Amino acid sequence: MPKVSIIVPVYNVEKYLEKCLNSLINQTLKDIEIIIVNDGSTDHSIEIINKYLEKYPNIIKYLYKENGGLSSARNYGMPYAKGEYMAFLDSDDYVEPNMYEEMYEIAQKENSDMVECDFIWEYPNKKRYDNGIIYNGKEEAIEKARVVAWNKLIKREIIEKTKIEFPFGLRYEDVEFFYKLVPYLNKISFVKKYFIHYVQRNNSIIATQNSKTKDIFKVFENVIEYYKNNGYYEQYKEQIEYSYVRLLLCSSLKRMCKIGNKEDRKQALEETWNNINCNFPNWKKNKLLKNKGLKNVYLRTMNQYTYKIYCSILSII
């Protein structure tokens, strides 16, 4: 059994794919499997994949499917994973050579259900180092974790037993996947090293703001429904409420303000405020808002009047 299975969805990334695959082939942890899921690419990605398949047939599995998006490709690859731990890597990103060895060693040492590392936002002309908070327990995971999937090593049996998948056709797929997993993560560990280069492209999903930005509403609706149906909601309600409000009024709101179509932008901003106050009418009383930090100061000052002011400011910066 491989130690780590790495699922790599591929869609029209011929400019980036070799760097991504080289970073995986050259891992110091040798007992890995790389599962490439070709999500219906129409560029020269397949020629690059075939070159690596021919050279490394023992560690690369190749799967093809019709185009369905990032979540669909990840979900398609998961049943083929045989490793003790599972990881995800987007095919325009790349990793440091010792990443999976060091994360796997910590997982073994601490019997971890999940291991998380830090990463670098890599822009054409600059880099930004993302140094995450070390959080303790499930409550803090919901409250403080970076919800991206690709900086984590996750025990495969947890994913298999829970049957948790990425939501089809929605942005913010990592948000739903991570929050659904949290109740089953009894031990979370950290490697405080910048292992992943998170490459920023102008035409990437995250860089393009449109009406799909509103998918965050459906994603959190799915999370809340899952927690209620599985008996976790009352236990984690405070954290879910706080994370919902923080995400919608911070990073998500900034994206909403950048929606190009004026009517779509106006509707998205109205829906954001209405959704928050409909789902959590007493959110201003959430005890987690009392914690220190600039984001909490910002959230505590938020009301129906300041909301419009903040939206106006975010639209022009």
Locate predicted features:
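Nucleotide-sugar donor-binding/catalytic module of glycosyltransferases
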Residues: M1-E221, E225
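Generic hydrophobic, helix-prone segments enriched in Leu/Val/Ile
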Residues: I6, Y85, E110, I216, ...
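Short, surface-exposed helix-loop/turn micro-motifs enriched in polar/charged residues
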Residues: E102, G169-L170, Y233-I240
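Short, hydrophobic secondary-structure boundary micro-motifs
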Residues: D130-N131, Y236, K284-N286
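Catalytic core of nucleotide-sugar-dependent glycosyltransferases
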Residues: F195-R201, A207-Q235, L247-P281
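Structural motif
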Residues: E234-Y244, L289-K292, V297
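Membrane-interface aromatic/basic loop that binds lipid-linked glycans or pyrophosphate carriers
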Residues: I259-I317
